[in-house]
Amino acid sequence: MAAVQAAEVKVDGSEPKLSKNELKRRLKAEKKVAEKEAKQKELSEKQLSQATAAATNHTTDNGVGPEEESVDPNQYYKIRSQAIHQLKVNGEDPYPHKFHVDISLTDFIQKYSHLQPGDHLTDITLKVAGRIHAKRASGGKLIFYDLRGEGVKLQVMANSRNYKSEEEFIHINNKLRRGDIIGVQGNPGKTKKGELSIIPYEITLLSPCLHMLPHLHFGLKDKETRYRQRYLDLILNDFVRQKFIIRSKIITYIRSFLDELGFLEIETPMMNIIPGGAVAKPFITYHNELDMNLYMRIAPELYHKMLVVGGIDRVYEIGRQFRNEGIDLTHNPEFTTCEFYMAYADYHDLMEITEKMVSGMVKHITGSYKVTYHPDGPEGQAYDVDFTPPFRRINMVEELEKALGMKLPETNLFETEETRKILDDICVAKAVECPPPRTTARLLDKLVGEFLEVTCINPTFICDHPQIMSPLAKWHRSKEGLTERFELFVMKKEICNAYTELNDPMRQRQLFEEQAKAKAAGDDEAMFIDENFCTALEYGLPPTAGWGMGIDRVAMFLTDSNNIKEVLLFPAMKPEDKKENVATTDTLESTTVGTSV
């Protein structure tokens, strides 16, 4: 209406004169809107009244509360909050400090699943706890609960005859709703139909759920809600819990594997004066006491190599890295990596270690070397990824020449402007996008992504990168212009990067200076010159090989997840208020189109 009125305002600001028919039409429309609002308000008040009555009436369906769950979620929250407040007024504590648990739900099921239908072990009393996911009444004296926790379900069969009095039975069970966390004291048993249950004589409310819990039958499928309210996702979706158990197993396996090889786990700073160790755009923060900007680490590499200089020959770190770059299905601004550095080794040694670690991890976690993966989601095409060693190995430049069907300049000429122009022309001819700055390194990276990475379904080592793409890697001992580096790709995605480390301080400083020129030319991802690191190299870094793995992507493959948010407990999300502001702006823009004079 406001947009219509705005459109009808005259240039001189005076109100337009409406015809009788138009005035009548508008009054009729306004009356209709008012009647609709009044009717909705009356309906809401009626629902609220019914639900409140159900919440306080102890004779209604033993408090299962279908009337409550038919109301608006906001009204449900109000009703539930009032009920919990009333418990406090009556001297009851809905949030007790402690409840002793004798046995987990998992152990209970394992220990008593052998019982026969109709068994009731009255001589065994146990305490268990969990969250109510369903509540069903069978008459006035028998109530069943589905108690969930630890990824399993146990039935609670509450019978009034097992309580001190029927009044006590009614009182406690009327307090409980779906979503509440309860403690149950009772006996193991099985129903006549063979359902393993705990048969209580006492139930304690440990923490009420004030919000209406979605029904398990419908589940929680909205991804936006799942990622923003991960706790709710975990409550309702058992498969989510399993994904994070697998993620934890991946980290545990890697840590154990490296420990057995004699590596020392270390911790290095997450805030750095100079961001180094990778080609990436950093986050910037500010230190009040030092009165200076600091950079969140993009990689821990340089610190690790300093420790190898100091005589710790085998080091590793599992931790968070931060890169101020895009968010998509495989990238998150903060992510988890494992990096290790091994003195007296080269990239050939690390390829063997990688094969053993990755294939062993897949076999340990899944029971097989083969994993089924759906890159486009559950409804898309399935791929069988075979992690059986040895993995395929290809030379980057040679394979790129085969894929392009043409010979590239000699690798010792890759740093020339002529080579850059040739690669630029190839990208244009092949319709390969490369945002500026169109440096040789970036052009090569885009071509490799377009023609080589897409062929890597099973684990594949892409080896011997050009020096211009690898400022921290050591030059190839037999191929000028290349480095002793490899990347491991699975399902077209990189999961590992490793190389024989550059330990010549003069050469390292020269490469840093070339990176500085690239940064000056507009490449935000180019490296800074790190003088402290160069000084450390001057004390002598032994022949060393370094390795890094993206834990999140490995977790994606082993949990069959095509979105990195599925394997991050709390992924980066745009704030909801910001989203609302954007939506409001869009709405305002759409309603004011054509209204300008």
Curated annotation (Swiss-Prot):
Effect of R80H: In DEAPLE; uncertain significance
Enzyme Commission numbers on file: 2.7.7.-, 6.1.1.6
Listed result of changing V448F: In DEAPLE; uncertain significance
Binding residues for substrate: G277, E301, E339, Y341, N497, E501
Post-translational modification: Phosphorylated on a serine residue after mast cell stimulation with immunoglobulin E (IgE).
Residue positions where N6-acetyllysine is found in the record: K88, K141
Free-text activity regulation comment from the record: Up-regulated by DARS and EEF1A1, but not by AIMP2.
Effect recorded for S207D: Phosphomimetic mutant that strongly enhances translocation into the nucleus and production of diadenosine tetraphosphate (Ap4A). Almost complete loss of tRNA ligase activity
Outcome of mutating L350H: Found in a patient with hypertrophic cardiomyopathy and mild intellectual disability together with proximal muscle weakness; uncertain significance
Residues recorded as bearing N-acetylalanine in the entry: A2
Biased composition (Low complexity): 51-60
Result of altering S207A: Strongly reduced production of diadenosine tetraphosphate (Ap4A). Reduced protein phosphorylation
The keyword S-adenosyl-L-methionine appears for this protein: no
Example GO molecular function: ATP binding
Effect of L568F: In LEPID; decreases tRNA-lysine aminoacylation activity of both the mitochondrial and cytosolic forms. Does not rescue the developmental defects caused by KARS1 depletion in xenopus
Catalytic reaction annotation: tRNA(Lys) + L-lysine + ATP = L-lysyl-tRNA(Lys) + AMP + diphosphate
Modified residues (Phosphoserine): S207, S590, S596
Basic and acidic residues bias spans: 9-45
Domain notes: The N-terminal domain (1-65) of the cytoplasmic isoform is a functional tRNA-binding domain, is required for nuclear localization, is involved in the interaction with DARS, but has a repulsive role in the binding to EEF1A1. A central domain (208-259) is involved in homodimerization and is required for interaction with HIV-1 GAG and incorporation into virions. The C-terminal domain (452-597) is not required for interaction with AIMP2.
Membership in a protein family: Belongs to the class-II aminoacyl-tRNA synthetase family.
Illness association: Charcot-Marie-Tooth disease, recessive intermediate B: A form of Charcot-Marie-Tooth disease, a disorder of the peripheral nervous system, characterized by progressive weakness and atrophy, initially of the peroneal muscles and later of the distal muscles of the arms. Recessive intermediate forms of Charcot-Marie-Tooth disease are characterized by clinical and pathologic features intermediate between demyelinating and axonal peripheral neuropathies, and motor median nerve conduction velocities ranging from 25 to 45 m/sec. Deafness, autosomal recessive, 89: A form of non-syndromic deafness characterized by bilateral, prelingual, moderate to severe hearing loss affecting all frequencies.
Protein's recorded name: Lysine--tRNA ligase
